[in-house]
Amino acid sequence: MNISLIFANELITRAFGNQGKLPWQFIKEDMQFFQKTTENSVVVMGLNTWRSLPKMKKLGRDFIVISSTITEHEVLNNNIQIFKSFESFLEAFRDTTKPINVIGGVGLLSEAIEHASTVYMSSIHMVKPVHADVYVPVELMNKLYSDFKYPENILWVGDPIDSVYSLSIDKFVRPASLVGVPNDINT
């Protein structure tokens, strides 16, 4: 099973969301990367992330929502599968050959990082401060920097001084020997 995390956050504060939306303006290059990376894959998210998705093209992706409270009525017209827990999703998809991309929220990212072989993290630096009510937890960042190889920068856009924003997308790869190994064994 090939599991990746793909998420964006503000570089300095680690802001992740604000009132169910991204805390920064739309960044074309980041959205293009996200769409290309998640195409023809299984996209896993929590309920709030599902509700926050724009009405974008959802073709070429299998959507999974992890929620113990969502109802079938809420998603009747959408092409998604619902699982009560990330563990039940893993069990059901254990033999899949499709790439799996976990996109949020932060609780699900924190749980899924234990199973991930790759993390794509977009770090956005805004010249003006952003407002947020959800942040990437320090524990998730610590896990990322302790269990994964030093990142490879795969995209850089903008200038942090002369632009409204700069964007850096980094790819972290976990050494194969640590994929799926609980954190207490890694130390």
Swiss-Prot record:
<dbReference type="GO" id="GO:0046654">
    <property type="term" value="P:tetrahydrofolate biosynthetic process"/>
</dbReference>
<dbReference type="InterPro" id="IPR012259">
    <property type="entry name" value="DHFR"/>
</dbReference>
<keyword id="KW-0487">Methotrexate resistance</keyword>
<dbReference type="Pfam" id="PF00186">
    <property type="entry name" value="DHFR_1"/>
</dbReference>
<protein>
    <recommendedName>
        <fullName>Dihydrofolate reductase type A10</fullName>
        <ecNumber>1.5.1.3</ecNumber>
    </recommendedName>
</protein>
<dbReference type="GO" id="GO:0004146">
    <property type="term" value="F:dihydrofolate reductase activity"/>
</dbReference>
<dbReference type="GO" id="GO:0046677">
    <property type="term" value="P:response to antibiotic"/>
</dbReference>
<comment type="subunit">
    <text>Homodimer.</text>
</comment>
<dbReference type="GO" id="GO:0050661">
    <property type="term" value="F:NADP binding"/>
</dbReference>
<dbReference type="GO" id="GO:0006730">
    <property type="term" value="P:one-carbon metabolic process"/>
</dbReference>
<dbReference type="InterPro" id="IPR001796">
    <property type="entry name" value="DHFR_dom"/>
</dbReference>
<keyword id="KW-0614">Plasmid</keyword>
<dbReference type="InterPro" id="IPR024072">
    <property type="entry name" value="DHFR-like_dom_sf"/>
</dbReference>
<dbReference type="GO" id="GO:0046452">
    <property type="term" value="P:dihydrofolate metabolic process"/>
</dbReference>
<comment type="function">
    <text>Key enzyme in folate metabolism. Catalyzes an essential reaction for de novo glycine and purine synthesis, and for DNA precursor synthesis.</text>
</comment>
<dbReference type="GO" id="GO:0031427">
    <property type="term" value="P:response to methotrexate"/>
</dbReference>
<comment type="pathway">
    <text>Cofactor biosynthesis; tetrahydrofolate biosynthesis; 5,6,7,8-tetrahydrofolate from 7,8-dihydrofolate: step 1/1.</text>
</comment>
<keyword id="KW-0521">NADP</keyword>
<dbReference type="InterPro" id="IPR017925">
    <property type="entry name" value="DHFR_CS"/>
</dbReference>
<keyword id="KW-0046">Antibiotic resistance</keyword>
<comment type="similarity">
    <text>Belongs to the dihydrofolate reductase family.</text>
</comment>
<feature type="domain" description="DHFR">
    <location>
        <begin position="2"/>
        <end position="174"/>
    </location>
</feature>
<keyword id="KW-0817">Trimethoprim resistance</keyword>
<keyword id="KW-0554">One-carbon metabolism</keyword>
<dbReference type="GO" id="GO:0046655">
    <property type="term" value="P:folic acid metabolic process"/>
</dbReference>
<keyword id="KW-0560">Oxidoreductase</keyword>
